[in-house]
Amino acid sequence: MKLPKAKNLNAEKYVAGLSLFKQKIAKIKLSANESALGPSPKAIKEYIKASKDFKRYPDSDGTFLRKTIAKKFKLDQSRIILGNGSDQVFELICKAFLQKNDEVIVSQYSFIIYRIYSKLNSAKVIYATENNFTSSVDTILACVTNKTKIIFIANPNNPTGTYISKNNILKLRKKLRSDILLVVDDAYFEYMNLKNYECGLKLFSKFKNVVVTRTFSKIYGLAGLRVGWGYASKNIVEALYKIKPPFNVNRPALIAAAAAIKDTAWLNKEIHHVRKWSKKFYDIFKELNIHTNKTGVNFLLINFDRVKKTSQ
């Protein structure tokens, strides 16, 4: 009997960061860079209230949350699109802009989801080598061809924790062709406190060929609710809305996210906690001669090759 056959999907499967935690070997799960303190108590309270009424569909465009985001960051509400996590925004970008034989440039050690969605939409992924685990603007520019369509940059980067300076990322956009879409992933920007760093939203909010994405999964502690968003020109956002699934973010998630973004005190508490403990861990690893990156985010990258040599 001949059965239905799926088309050839030229992409690797995303494997969630459960590692040894799922096997109950690890006591604390660290592999997904989730919030240390969890969600704001105000967000939890609003989520519980909203969870008592499931019979109504959510606002398909998430108008209330988009309005809250726009007010918080002084943005144009009509240029905001919500996703079921920022992952979905990346998926929509790839669906809307990529065709067969297009090329997408990603950094050598970048978030895997960029290349998964690029390949699923028939694009060729080009890997720009990194310098000491840091994305190189010159190397990225050297990878550009007449087929380049999108460049994905996480700044700061996951999983390395390194970043591209303000001047260098502006240089990247300036030297790219205007028809190449630059996507800047701001997932971890809130933790950064370095003079030569600036978030994508502040640098590119007025650009018509840049999409900046953000998430509620990290510093806001709402990873289980799946809420992310993108900010781009009206033309780009209109294209994404044409293919965005209806009701893609559930109502309790929308309401909890709106409460979370307003709770500045809780946000600052999380930032203080992360900065305090990342410095402590860095100093401990250094004392033990374990090589790691000095980071401005909520995770550390450890070189286990050096750890092995040290232990020997």
Where in the sequence are the language-model features?
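N-terminal "arm"/small-domain region of PLP-dependent enzymes with the aminotransferase-like
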Residues: 1-56, 68
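Phosphate-binding glycine-rich loop
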Residues: 63-103
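PLP-dependent aminotransferase-like
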Residues: 96-153
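Active-site pre-lysine segment of PLP-dependent enzymes
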Residues: 119, 137-146, 159-182, 186-219
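Short beta-strands and strand-loop turn motifs
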Residues: 127-128, 150-156, 182-186, 293-295
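PLP-dependent aminotransferase class I/II
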Residues: 209-285, 290-293
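Conserved PLP-binding catalytic core of the aspartate aminotransferase-like
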Residues: 285-312
